[in-house]
Design a protein with these regions (language model features):
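Juxtamembrane intracellular "pre-TM" segments in multi-pass secondary transporters
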Residues: 1-4, 201-231, 256
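Conserved MFS/SLC helix-loop-helix module at the cytosolic interface between two early adjacent transmembrane helices
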Residues: 61-97
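Extracellular/periplasmic helix-loop-helix junction of adjacent transmembrane segments
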Residues: 32-61
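Glycine-rich segments within core transmembrane alpha-helices of 12-TM secondary carriers
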Residues: 137-159, 272-280, 365-377
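Cytoplasmic helix-loop-helix junction between adjacent transmembrane helices
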Residues: 105-143
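Helix-breaking motifs and short loop linkers at transmembrane-helix boundaries and internal kinks
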Residues: 41, 74, 95-101, 129, ...
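Helix-loop-helix hairpin linking two adjacent transmembrane segments in secondary transporters
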Residues: 140-197
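Extracytoplasmic gate region of multi-pass secondary transporters
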Residues: 29-30, 226-280, 341, 345, ...
């Protein structure tokens, strides 16, 4: 049946906690690159594939069928099982005896986490009145920015375990610190899964309109291909850079300036949390102001400007000779960069008819996750190997990725400004 506003708020709070936990389990590997490399004899490229491709393969692809499943069966069960599955997979990372085992465990993390957002979006859409849904979704999506806590919490866990030395577990015996860290961050999963069952699942609202047939949706994309190529290319290029930053800046600070994982995570986590939140709000505010002034291509124009603003800090930050200078420029980069995601999603929504907007958003998230996450984490060590001799020149590789991604993203957005304005005008007249 219907749920009260209080019950809706309880569910929203639980989903936000689950979303934050998912980022902790997803990102903690980036704080333990060096010990994992030494213990398993891995290269930077192999670690990059663990952070990106291994996670993204199932995370990106499974999200769409999970969303369809969430429209048919209990979303509470889907979310609870997903939380337990990704937490168990995170724990299995700590027991991995080879690269293949660790790769498969990371795939399991991606598979479990794919259950959360589609089901939570569906749940919240039924729990909140339409007038309050935007605010609820905004609060849930704060998990992306609050995901900066993943670095704070994860770094503290890694440092704590490292200071205590090897941990001895019954049956398994002594465990290296990085393995124990995976086990510790996996533990809250059981509690979060139990909390999901506290929330009361709302009845599903009747869908007043059927989705656009696949042929018609593809026809719309084809008729406005210049618009969609510009949006998808811009957002995918920026996501490649963004995932590269998340995956390799902790290693850059640890390897280049001898910071501990806890020290690196504290600095980067606070930047993500504070400046990332400000950037997200600023991007949306700028696009809204331009739209109110009659600029029809406001969202795409803002992401073009964001790409240009990111160019110099993305190029210079990883080349700085001191951690202080690096972090100042990284803070600017984070402030500018975080405004793109919301504007890109809004651009997609305005360029698609109402009955195919879920399809447009799903394709957007698929491209950002599968291409951005897979390539973004692997391209840094690939460039290091191809251009800098594979000597661990992560800073130079990050600078190269930043320069190329921002320039190409700006060009992609610029190329679609005129067609984008025409597309949204066409959609508005339907």
């Amino acid at each position: 049946g219907r749920v009260s506003l209080r019950q809706a708020h309880i569910a929203l709070g639980i989903f936000l906690v689950a979303y934050i936990l998912s980022f902790i389990d997803r990102q903690i590997l980036s704080l333990m690159v060096e010990p994992i490399k030494q213990d398993l004899g891995l290269s930077d490229l192999q670690v990059g594939l663990l952070q990106g491709l291994a996670f993204a393969i199932l995370y990106a692809v499974v999200g769409i069928p999970v969303g369809m499943l969430a429209d048919r069966i209990s979303r509470r069960r889907i979310i609870a099982v997903g939380v337990l599955f990704w937490s168990a997979s995170t724990a299995l990372c700590g027991f991995a005896g080879s690269y293949a085992h660790l790769f498969m465990a990371r795939m399991g993390v991606g598979l479990g986490e794919a259950s959360l957002s589609p089901s939570a979006h569906s749940w919240l859409s039924d729990a909140y009145p339409p007038a309050q849904l935007s605010r609820a979704m905004a609060i849930y999506n704060l998990g992306i920015t609050i995901g900066g806590l993943a670095l704070l919490v994860g770094g503290a866990v890694v440092d704590m375990v490292a200071q205590s030395g090897a941990i001895v577990l019954p049956v398994f015996g002594p465990m290296p610190t990085w393995r124990a860290a995976f086990l510790l961050v996996a533990l809250p999963g059981a509690l979060v899964a139990a909390l999901v069952f506290i929330a009361r699942e709302p009845a599903r609202r009747a869908r007043s309109k059927a989705g656009m047939p696949l042929r018609a949706a593809l026809s719309h994309l084809r008729d406005h291909k210049r618009t969609f190529i510009a949006i998808y290319a811009n957002s995918t290029l920026l996501s490649i850079m963004g995932y590269g930053l998340t995956a390799w800046y902790p290693t850059l600070l640890i390897r280049g300036f001898a910071l501990t994982p806890g020290q690196a995570s504290l600095r980067l986590g606070l930047i993500y949390l504070l400046l990332g939140s400000m950037g997200s709000l600023a991007g949306g505010f700028a696009a809204e102001r331009l739209t109110l002034k009659g600029v029809r291509d406001a969202n795409l124009r803002v992401v073009m400007i964001i790409a240009l603003l990111c160019l110099f800090p993305a190029l210079l930050a990883p080349l700085m000779p001191s951690p202080a200078l690096l972090l100042v420029l990284f803070g600017l980069l984070t402030l500018f960069f975080n405004g793109y995601f919301g504007c890109s999603l809004a651009a997609i929504q305005l360029a698609t008819p109402p009955n195919m907007r879920a399809t447009g958003a799903a394709l957007f998230l698929l491209a950002n996750s599968l291409v951005g996450l897979s390539l973004g984490t692997a391209i840094v060590p690939l460039i290091d190997s191809a251009l800098f001799g594979g000597h661990g020149q992560i800073g130079s590789a990050l600078a190269t990725v930043g320069l190329c991604a921002t320039l190409l993203a700006a060009v992609a957005a610029w190329s679609g400004l005129r067609s984008y304005a025409q597309t949204i005008e066409s959609v508005a007249q339907r």
